[in-house]
Amino acid sequence: MFKYEYDFSIVMGYYNRKPQLTNTLDKFKETYGEYNYEVIIVDDNSTAEHSLDELVKGYDYPINLIKITAEEKGNRINPSTVYNKGFREAKGKIVVIQNPECIHFGNLLGHLRSNLGHNDYFAFSAYNCTSADFTDNLLKNIHLVNDPNFNAQNNICWYNHPTTRPVHYHFCAAMMNDNLKMLGGFDEEFAKGAWFDDNEILLSISVNLGLKIQTLSPDVGFVVHQWHPRDAESKFTQEEHKALIEKNKALYDGYVKYHEEHQMQFPKLLHLYWDGSNFSYLNLLTVLSFNRYHTGWKINVFCPKDPVKTKSWTTNEQKDEYTGKNYFDELNKILNVNIHYIDFNNLPFKHKDASEVIKSDFFRLYVLNKYGGLWSDFDIVYTNNVEKYHKTHVKGDKKMLIYRYLWEEANRYVIPIGLFLGRKHNSILSGILQNIEKFYNPDQYQCLGCQMFQYIFNKENYMNAKPVLQKMKLTELGMQDAQCYLPMKWNELDKMYKDPSVKAVSVETDPDVFGVHWFNGAADAKHYCNNLDLDKLKSSSPQCLIDELVKKYI
């Protein structure tokens, strides 16, 4: 899905470590001549004597030096935003996250190339030197790491080690760039305090991505953490610095507590797709409302680099346009939102000229199968907690959840496609994707959406769908009641847009409901969005359910 120029990006945040970094860069040159890699150094406003402008010119491998100004840095000492600047520039398939003072011993890139998978986070063992003399002696004779006398004098020796101290921190660690993009890097809330950013990213790697975290044995290679003076904290008094630590500790502890109380068998990733058209305030409410009821989730918004403007289908769905204010840039202000611009030429979907609605229907299946998590349309206002709902409503170990409701007049189920929840690489989505070409029809608005799901999963059509179903392990599939996000159906729009008797409390207190799907493609919805006056609504009484839900956020 993402295209990369290098096999590896080695990303490091840097502040006043010039002698140590020189050793690190020299070792790269000595060890990794055969590898396709780049080094990204983000200089967090170092002093003049530690400037790297001339140093980086002395290496024949690509070094991207990014410098942070004094104004941009301010009084911040936490490096989370520093590393994130580097991550956004990383063009390697694998990202190595490390401190500049950590020098490699052994062929670390070779081990990663042969062993790191899409479900892995590897942290290399890190041997610490407690003085400049210990550093000099060890760099001259690396075998001293196994010398009991040297270790007794150097104590504490291992900052990271699979048995002695398995903290898994990123003294030198690696993961696939695809996975790092889904996290968005470090949580920048931690930039306001001190410490605990490394704890949070490990929590996110586990809870949000579901990766296997491990610290590798020194036998496969390790890093030496070269001694350096700790001068970053000197701008604060001891009391001030302690307060910054406590601030981040409270933030981290809050995340841990939330995830312990809201455990979920699916990755905590929310995926959304937007086609580049005008983005209404109601669309924005999908993210604002989700964040009101959820903590510690990562939200990924995917947009096409070159959206197709034509609408190939011959029916009347989604023909009306929203022409009001574009609120899309508001998403950039939300720290847990990552926006990705996708080139469909890099995806295994041959119909590159397909209409955006149809491409988005393919894309939701592809992304959900690749990463797992919750797929949501951009026309759901969340009114409660998704994790809480699924804890009480899902029975058994399910890997894919589809939501449906009974159409009583026709005596069959309707399967809408506004919401899916899945684990990555489940057999349900894999089976559908293997057969996707059977269902593509540019004349049909829902050819890869509701129409396809109705064909596959309604029992009346079992014999026709059997070749597709046989590709699946149906025990992985759970069918949930779509009432949870569709308390009003497509033919009940008046209950949302016109009926003043329908109140928000009815959907906020219902244990079987966690959201309201407001049907962005409907004419009533477009009319509402085009005529919404936030200032007027803020100072007046709501006239309908959607008014009441919107007013909670203005």
What are these regions (language model features)?
Residues V95, G373-W375:
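Short aromatic/hydrophobic "clamp" motif used to bind/position activated sugar donors
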Residues F8-Q20, T24, T31-Y32, V42, ...:
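A conserved hydrophobic helix/loop-capping motif in glycosyltransferases and polysaccharide synthases
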Residues E71-A90, I358-R364:
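Glycine-rich, basic loop-to-helix element that forms the pyrophosphate-binding segment
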Residues F87-R88, F105-E189, H390-C450:
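Conserved catalytic core of nucleotide-sugar-dependent glycosyltransferases
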